[in-house]
Amino acid sequence: MHSKNLCLSLTSLCLLAAADTALAEDWQYSLEAGMANAPRYSGSDERMTAPVLGGRIISPWGVFLDTDTGLGWGYEGNALSFSAYVGASDSRKDKNESMHAGSKRLKGMGEIKSRPQLGVSAAYNLGGVIIGATLEHAIEEDKHKETGKAFTHLELSLGTNLYEGRYGSVDAAINSHFGDRNYLQTWYGVTADQATRSRFKEYEARAGNISNGMNLSWSVPINEHTQFSTLLDVQYLADEAGKSPIVEQRLQASVLGELQYTF
């Protein structure tokens, strides 16, 4: 399983603490390890549990290297934060593999390969409410292939801190995801050729709303350098995605438990 989706959700909530893109006085390093339980792919009613491993390096000048987003630069002001990065897009296989999204139920749909991806993310603190937006564009892998076209994804979010005290910190956010036509067609559409090779009927997906949902995280400090975080992510697939024949369940829930060590 690629840890990116869940870890990005956790990172977006951590914007409240301004930990990921702030200009540090010194180099910052962090390591993360945990377990995640999530649907095998977006729309699946099958579930899988897999380890989640990651790391992050942030320089005093805002340059960062992150296993979830990639290589980039970030800035943190009093209320506004911004980052731009180059990384790798998500992938999906048409067979069961313990460390990758996908399912044998998708046999014949072909593999969606990871490819270079450009991203920008911004957040504004409006009196304790974090308004966030993340735009990602995956580069074309093969324009003649059903799963290789360039696509664009946008996430809009509103987050806030619900509790901070002796039992740690609880943060929550609501979000909506949007995609262009190529994104929806790549992840939820079924072409005529795919229909002949798989068990799904042909389906042409259009640009629009992918899903709407919420994240809830609880972070508990263990000592000066270590904290344990849990995340619940719930998404409801909207019409263009939810009506796809590959979608077996529109309500998608994922959970993550992660230990983070910063030094």
Placement of each model-derived feature along the sequence:
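Residues on the lipid-exposed face of transmembrane beta-strands in outer-membrane beta-barrel proteins
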Residues: A33-N37, L53-S59, T69-Y75, L118-Y124, ...
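Residues that define the transmembrane beta-barrel architecture of outer-membrane proteins
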Residues: W27, N37, R47-L53, I57, ...
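Outer-membrane beta-barrel translocator domains and adjoining extracellular loop/strand segments
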Residues: G43-M48, K95-H100, K143-A150, Y183-T191, ...
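Outer-membrane beta-barrel transmembrane domain signature
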Residues: I139, K143-Q227, Y236-A238, F263
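Transmembrane beta-strands of outer-membrane beta-barrel pores
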Residues: M35-P39, S59-W61, V86-R92, L126-G128, ...
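Outer-membrane beta-barrel domain signature
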Residues: R40-S44, D66, L71, K107-E111, ...
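Repeated loop/turn-to-beta-strand initiation elements of outer-membrane beta-barrel proteins
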Residues: W61-L65, L80, G128-I131, R166-V170, ...
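N-terminal signal peptide c-region/cleavage motif recognized by signal peptidases
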Residues: A18-A19
